[in-house]
Amino acid sequence: MNTATGFIVLLVLATVLGGIEAGESHMRKDAMGRVRRQYCVPVDQPCSLNTQPCCDDATCTQELNENDNTVYYCRA
């Protein structure tokens, strides 16, 4: 195999591997996006007003705990 043929083979191989890697990272990005969009805080769990929403039509409500500290919980 001469130098030109070897160079072409390496170029094709790099292109194929690059395409496979790009395709996998694109799929990974889509999957992570779906996971992030579907995440919500379960009912009766602590929440934050500026983070993920509560599940099952619950709302993040302010309450006082036993030490009179303000806490937030998802309540239905």
UniProtKB/Swiss-Prot annotation:
Primary localisation category: secreted
Signal peptide start-end: 1-22
Propeptide position ranges: 23-35
Swiss-Prot/TrEMBL keywords: Cleavage on pair of basic residues, Disulfide bond, Ion channel impairing toxin, Knottin, Secreted, Signal, Toxin
An example Gene Ontology CC term for this record: extracellular region
GO molecular function annotations of the record: ion channel regulator activity; toxin activity
Tissues expressed in: Expressed by the venom gland.
Disulfide bonds: 40-55, 47-60, 54-74
Compartment list: Secreted
Domain notes: The presence of a 'disulfide through disulfide knot' structurally defines this protein as a knottin.
Known function: Toxin that may inhibit ion channels.
General remark: Several paralogs that code for the same precursor are shown in this entry, whereas an additional paralog is shown in AC S0F1N2.
Similarity field: Belongs to the neurotoxin 08 (Shiva) family. 02 (omega/kappa toxin) subfamily.
Protein name: Omega/kappa-hexatoxin-Ar1g
Naturally occurring in which organism (per UniProt): Atrax robustus
